[in-house]
Every structure is written in C-alpha cells, then in structure tokens.
Design a protein with these regions (language model features):
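Short, contiguous clusters of charged residues that form electrostatic/catalytic patches at enzyme active sites
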Residues: 1-5, 91-95, 116, 165-168
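Alpha-helix termination/capping residues and helix-transition junctions
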Residues: 9-12, 57, 103, 176
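Short internal alpha-helix immediately C-terminal to a glycine-rich phosphate-binding loop
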Residues: 1-38, 96
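Glycine-rich phosphate-binding loop and adjacent beta-alpha segment
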Residues: 38, 46, 55-56, 74-78, ...
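Adenosine-nucleotide cofactor-binding segment
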Residues: 36-116
Length: 181
C-alpha cells in the first residue's frame, strides 16, 4: 500500500501507468488490485502466459511475458558489447509497454525482484517517475546505468508495507470488498 500511496509526490492517481513485476504473485496481485481501485492502469509482468487471465481478472490493463525479452540480471559493463545487447532488449521491452500505454513510459514501477530487474526498471520509468522497491527476491546487488537516473530525474525509493494509518486504509478497502486478499 505504501509503495503506491505513501511516497509523495509520487502517489498513485487515476490514469497513471504502473509496471508491476511478478503480477501473478502475492505482492504483484495486490498491487494490480490497488491500481484498479485507484483508477490507474496496471501493466503486469508475468513469466508464463498461463498466468495472464488471472492477472487480467485482478484488474490489470495488460500483461507482458518477461520471457520474451533478454534484459534481466545485473547490468553488463556500460558500453561493452554485452551492454549494447542488453539495451536493445530493454528498448524492446519498453516498446512492449508502450503498446499498452499509448506510447507513454510508466509513471511508477512496482519493484520487488531487485537484482534481475532493477536496471530495466530504471530505464523504463518515465522522466520524473519513480521506481519503488520493497524487496530483493532475485538478489540484493542492484545495478543500473546512473545516467538514466540523474539525466531524466528519476527517483528510486525504498519502501515497505505501511504505517498504522496506511494499514488502516488498506484494511478498509478489504472491508469494503474492493480488494481481494
């Protein structure tokens, strides 16, 4: 909850686009539902096409299968041939996102895999947007091309579930049956 509503000025609003890693898992499916409740557009990243219907049923606008791309893991040394290959795939992934956002970069990236996805998250979030992270399920050694961070004024924000007020707000959504835990 805090990841999407607790880090001003990057607070989820109607019409915003949010990329959600692991959209069929516990954290991801919760984030998809929060986006739907807020009127935002969740683009869920999945690892298997069999998970698409579930993610869409939770309220995602679209899904993208990460296995169709090869831009995962720690970022290769900048300007190396491996880096250039990585960036070609990251651009391809960004274009796949644009197919669902009318050519716009995402406002927020809901990040929890960490090591395998952070470089791509920082690349695809919009200028002035936020990558918000609450875990490192694929590892804790985060790499990125810092030029995309400072030249495009992006924010990387650490987070966790919620403070007492935010927990109460999240619980209220469940009591109102607007979220399915």
């Amino acid at each position: 909850y805090r990841m999407l509503f607790g880090h001003r000025p990057h607070v989820l609003r109607p019409g915003q686009n949010v990329l959600i890693w692991g959209a069929s898992g516990g954290l991801g499916s919760y984030a998809v539902q929060l986006c739907a409740v807020a009127g935002a557009n969740a683009i869920g990243v999945i690892s298997d096409d069999s998970k698409a219907d579930f993610v869409l049923s939770m309220g995602a606008k679209a899904v993208i299968n990460r296995n169709n791309f090869k831009c995962w893991g720690q970022l290769p040394k900048v300007n190396s041939p491996e880096f250039n290959d990585y960036m070609k795939e990251a651009r391809k992934f960004g274009k796949a996102i644009w197919q669902h956002t009318n050519g716009k970069d995402v406002d927020i990236v809901f990040e929890h895999p960490g090591e395998s996805t952070m470089p791509t998250s920082v690349f695809v979030v919009k200028r002035g947007g936020m990558v918000v992270i609450c875990a490192g399920t694929t590892g804790f050694n985060l790499t990125m091309d810092a030029r995309f961070l400072w030249m495009r004024q992006k924010r990387v924000q650490g987070s966790h579930f919620a403070n007492l007020l935010q927990a109460s707000q999240a619980n209220q959504l469940m009591l109102e049956r607007r979220l399915d835990p």
